[in-house]
């Protein structure tokens, strides 16, 4: 049977980065690695309803910086910052180190593979049809700009005696293209018939194309800000010149240019 390599692990150093960034010698490496696993499990369990997609961990000396990517930052921060302060204190007691906790919002959770997988798993736990849950997730992702989505649900689907896998997909998901920005997520649904696994792949386009689109968007925003201020490159009063005005200026520049010299007359 064909097995698929993890899309994130295959693309680390190309279009993906490590979620854990620190260095340790052989004596301390295993202890710090186990500590990272405990931190991630604790945050995920405590804030599961907040839609936690990724948890990045950075270490420097005796300090730990944790970056939580969530779809609901308000649930993590809490009222007047009480939630994040309490979580920070609990992690400090668990690790015995100074903790710095940052929260980053996921603006489009429908395009985050981990959050999509968890959403489908929650719907399966509520006995919703797996085909309907997969179809709705794919439609939302494609409507928001995804170029391809693939979903696999495996287990005793619908309480069947024999486990099976069902797939749904739309668009393209080029798993062999290393420059492709493919997000992957996995979640499990705990049902009365046992666990049902949910795997989600979302293809958001090639990394170079996304970077170019971001640059074009930034240039457009700068032009709009310049237009509101009456910036350079515009006509009188900061207004954009029309096509006719630009053509008239070009004709005037051509007519005012240097005239050809008559070499036969010696002039």
Curated annotation (Swiss-Prot):
InterPro entries: KH_dom (IPR004087), KH_dom-like_a/b (IPR015946), KH_dom_type_2 (IPR004044), KH_sf_prok-type (IPR009019), Ribosomal_S3_C_sf (IPR036419), Ribosomal_uS3_bac-typ (IPR005704), Ribosomal_uS3_C (IPR001351), Ribosomal_uS3_CS (IPR018280). Residues 39-107 form the KH type-2 domain. Residues 212-246 are annotated as: Disordered. Keywords: Ribonucleoprotein, Ribosomal protein, RNA-binding, rRNA-binding. It holds the Pfam family Ribosomal_S3_C. GO terms for molecular function: mRNA binding; rRNA binding; structural constituent of ribosome. One of its GO terms (cellular component) is cytosolic small ribosomal subunit. Residues 213-224 have a biased composition (Basic and acidic residues). It comes from the Bacteria. Disulfide bonds: none annotated. GO terms for biological process: translation. Binds the lower part of the 30S subunit head. Binds mRNA in the 70S ribosome, positioning it for translation. PANTHER family: 30S/40S RIBOSOMAL PROTEIN S3, SMALL RIBOSOMAL SUBUNIT PROTEIN US3C. Belongs to the universal ribosomal protein uS3 family. Part of the 30S ribosomal subunit. Forms a tight complex with proteins S10 and S14. This is Small ribosomal subunit protein uS3. It comes from Symbiobacterium thermophilum (strain DSM 24528 / JCM 14929 / IAM 14863 / T).
